[in-house]
A protein has these predicted regions:
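Long, contiguous binding/interaction regions
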Residues: 1-70
């Protein structure tokens, strides 16, 4: 499954390595299509997530639990 999502990071979530965790924990491939983010400030990423459908859903839930709006 491949899906495009916009991730909105509040300022307190910009220092977390959540995209790395998506790769390691959920076996997802991430293609960053657009990024507007600065350390210590809010920002957004347009990404394409590719992986097994249950893992994509779990990965999105993980992001939301860590303060990222999907």
């Amino acid at each position: 499954m491949t899906t495009k999502v916009i991730l909105y990071f509040p300022s307190d979530a910009t220092d977390k390595a959540v995209t790395y965790d998506l790769v390691k924990r959920y076996d997802l491939r991430i293609n960053i299509l657009r990024a507007e983010i600065e350390a210590g400030r809010s920002g957004s990423l347009l990404v394409e997530l590719t992986g097994e459908e249950p893992m994509v859903r779990e990965g999105v839930a993980y992001l939301e639990r860590n303060g990222v709006t999907v």
